[in-house]
Structures are given as C-alpha cells and as structure tokens.
Amino acid sequence: MARADKATAVADIAAQFKESTATLITEYRGLTVANLAELRRSLTGSATYAVAKNTLIKRAASEAGIEGLDELFVGPTAIAFVTGEPVDAAKAIKTFAKEHKALVIKGGYMDGHPLTVAEVERIADLESREVLLAKLAGAMKGNLAKAAGLFNAPASQLARLAAALQEKKACPGPDSAE
C-alpha cells in the first residue's frame, strides 16, 4: 500500500471514528468472506463493518482523539462503526459470535470510554431504546390512571354516602312504625 493510500485510509477511518456513536472491535480470524458479508448484512443500517491493518487503525484512533484501545488492535481486527443504536449493533455481533465461534469480541468504545468485552455483552443484552421508552410510557400511563382513580375516589365515595343517606331518609325504618 502506497504512503498516499495509507494516509487516505487513516483519514477515512478517523472520520468513521468521529462520526460513530460507538465502535465495536472484533477479531475475525477463521471467518470466510461469505461469513463477513453475512455479518455486514445483519448489522442492517445501524453500523458499518470494516477490516483494516492494525497500524492504520491505531493512527486513525489517535487522530480521532480515541485512547485506550491500542491493546485491542492485535491480530486480524475488524471494527463495527455504529452510527445508529449501539444496542442493535452489539446484539447483532453477539448473536453472530454465538453462531460463529471464530468471531471474537475484543471490546469497544462509547461515550469517550473504552469498553471491555463484558460491557459490550451487557450492552447487547439491553433492550432497544424504543422498547425501553415504550415500557416507560406504559409505566407512566398505569401510574397516571391510578392517580386519577385516587383523585376521583373521595368524590365518588361522598356521592355514594349522600345517596345512601337520602335513601335512608326516604325509607321509613322499623322504629317509625310504632
């Protein structure tokens, strides 16, 4: 690879680092081209999966201001640059790694911090943002309905009490028959 090509590659990778909400770093040793294509398809539109030389990745990360990942750039390295929801990309990679033991998750980078393998797997185990928001909305709706019931309860109890008193006055009791 010529020096100019390397500089262009470093600039492209650095731009991807800067544009990404998260990066997931994997080792792809033993995967076929067909496997890599399948993994790229499984990432849908939320991430791009790129294979590059470790020295170029290290330089690009340095240019992008990303530190703490150098020990991950050993062996055949591929990076998922996540532009969408990190949970979706992490789930796709974790699922693919379960099906294809040759893919090894090495770590990642998100919100200015390096991620361990365990942290990437925890992110993959989270539910998507939309599901969490739906659960929050459902919980809020249920609590609002309970609150409305509590606020209406004293008024309805007072109305039932007034109706019972009126009914009692309207019906002569056994004491008034004497």
From Swiss-Prot:
GO CC entries: cytosolic large ribosomal subunit; peptidoglycan-based cell wall; plasma membrane
Listed SUPFAM superfamilies: Ribosomal protein L10-like
Source species of the chain: Mycobacterium tuberculosis (strain ATCC 25618 / H37Rv)
Biological process terms in GO annotation: translation
Alphabetized Pfam families for the sequence: Ribosomal_L10 (PF00466)
Ranges in a coiled coil: none
Full protein name: Large ribosomal subunit protein uL10
Protein's job: Forms part of the ribosomal stalk, playing a central role in the interaction of the ribosome with GTP-bound translation factors.
